[in-house]
A protein has these predicted regions:
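Non-heme di-metal
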Residues: 1-246
Length: 246
């Protein structure tokens, strides 16, 4: 039986490497670390979280359309995908509720369209779910369920800089608690289904790809925020109520 600890260790190292590369140059992260206290940044960021996360249950469920040859392994993986998809339903509403907790008058129907970087990220995850190795989406899942340790400094900076409370960032706080359980589950299913080196290579490539594209998404959020405060991104006018913390 394959010992998966070395593989999980390599995934963890890859996450750290990719995230460190993002942190060094990403304006979204660096502006917060430098003390940016303008809540309008959240007015741009949280809609992108919403626009990303609402696709998670769909892309997770789409994987099963490719598991057409029943086997013990494929049936276990199918059950995992469908169960996990169901558990992800509605998580984007946390981002919506966080905006509302800040006093923003927003609804599902009024959410702005995604930025091009968010669209690219989402399209990549759809490709992972519908083409190539059927297990590769687990690379994205592994990152998504273990990324909150990396996002913790961002959440802490947002709370401190913008003088917020935990109730204003439920997506980070509550979602992070939920994903502790999911992190254990994704390790278990990887150990059950990733039986070949090709499977593990596909999972690793997907993990690295999703982190890099998420970094691009964060950079685009910051660029869009800068346009917004100059009056050049009217799709975010609902967030005008937000401003530098008092």
């Amino acid at each position: 039986m394959t010992d998966f600890k070395p593989f999980f260790d390599s995934l963890d190292r890859a996450m750290a490497e990719e995230w460190d590369a993002i942190v060094k140059v990403n304006p979204f992260f660096n502006s917060l670390m430098d003390g940016l206290d303008d809540r309008r940044l959240l007015g741009v960021y949280l809609p992108e979280v919403y626009n990303t996360v609402k696709h998670s249950p769909i892309t997770q469920a789409l994987v099963v359309q490719r598991l057409v040859n029943p086997s013990t392994t494929s049936l276990r993986y199918m059950a995992y995908c469908l169960r996990h998809a169901l558990e992800e339903v509605g998580h984007e509403q946390m981002a919506l509720n966080d905006l509302r907790s800040l006093g923003v008058d927003i609804s599902n129907e009024r959410m702005p369209p995604p930025t091009i970087a968010t669209e690219a990220f989402t399209a990549y995850v759809y490709r992972l779910a519908t083409t190539g190795n059927p297990y590769q989406r687990l690379g994205y899942t592994y990152w998504a369920e273990n990324c909150y340790a990396y996002f913790a400094p961002i959440a802490m900076a947002i709370v401190q800089n913008m003088k917020l409370e935990a109730k204003n960032l439920t997506f980070f706080v509550q979602h992070g608690e939920i994903d502790k359980k999911h992190g254990e589950e994704v390790r278990k299913i990887i150990a059950e289904v990733a039986t070949t080196q090709a499977d593990r290579d596909a999972i690793m490539a997907a993990l690295r790809g999703t982190i890099r594209l998420q970094g691009a998404m964060l950079a685009e959020v910051h660029r869009t925020y800068e346009l917004f405060i100059k009056g050049q991104a009217p799709q975010y006018d609902f967030a005008k109520i937000l401003g530098p913390s008092l």
